[in-house]
Amino acid sequence: MTSHLLKAEIHCHLEGAAPPALVVKQAEKYGIDTSGFLRDGQYVWSDFAEFIQCYDAVAQVFKSDEDYAVLTETYLTELAEANTIYSELIISPDHGDRIGLGADAYLAGVAEGIRIAKEKTGIETRIIVTGERHFGPERVIAAAEYAARIRHPLVTGFNMAGEERMGRVADYARAFDIARDAGLGLTIHAGEVCGPESVADALDLVKPSRIGHGVRAIEDAALISRLVETGTVLEVCPGSNIALSVYPDFASHPLKALSDAGVRVCISSDDPPFFFTSLAREYALAADAFGFNDAEINRMTRTALECAFVDEATRERLLARLGDA
């Protein structure tokens, strides 16, 4: 049992955390037919491309800043109830623009949900702005420029997500230069759908402190040595990897092998209801499927806090809470 352990999550896409029950309620509010992507309380998709389409359909039921405040508060409250003390939410200003809300109002809604959740539960949260790779380099660069320009106190990181097979990392490197120059923490999705070469490209061209997923690095011993040497943290999401058939089962998943090799790893839920999981389940899997003991799981939580995109005073406060638990 891991319910008693304090938890931290640094890889979760906000719209991907939308509970099906909330999506149904939102769809009724706006008269949206959900039958194409939500049936019997579960999201419907069969491969990565369909997952992206389903994700986008779910996101369409959130149309106002108030909607985003409700979504954010709902998810963070769920995390807090599972003993989570820190969360980073990945959001896309592109989505705010596409639905006609605008990036500023979209961000304001998320920030309000964070405020309410912290007031209710004490959970600490930061925001990672992401560019969507499948929209092309110009849109990813625009997302980085927005994150750099907005100077929002809760926006502390920049990411690139989306279809990993779209374009070369080099095509998007300028976006990360912009974010780095603005003082934002850097993370990038790599080594999930694509192999270890995508992780190597990320290290060479982006030089992030963290990599989203990165599990395919296990296929290259030299790359593993490099990750150990650089101390780059892998944001590992086992339930997501199984659901998307990156690995056939947990016995095949390399989380334990990565940890045993000395790679810094932590665990997150990615898009939890899409992958029939939750952060609480990911922590339980760490024990039940991978054989980590409480001390080893706490070490992964400590890693998440050590590499979190927060100011040092907040980091020390969070680490002290973990140390006192």
UniProtKB/Swiss-Prot annotation:
It comes from the Bacteria. Binds 1 zinc ion per subunit. Zn(2+) binds at H11, H13, H189, D270. Its EC number is 3.5.4.2. GO terms for biological process: adenine catabolic process; hypoxanthine salvage; nucleotide metabolic process. The active site is at E192. This is Adenine deaminase. It comes from Agrobacterium fabrum (strain C58 / ATCC 33970) (Agrobacterium tumefaciens (strain C58)).
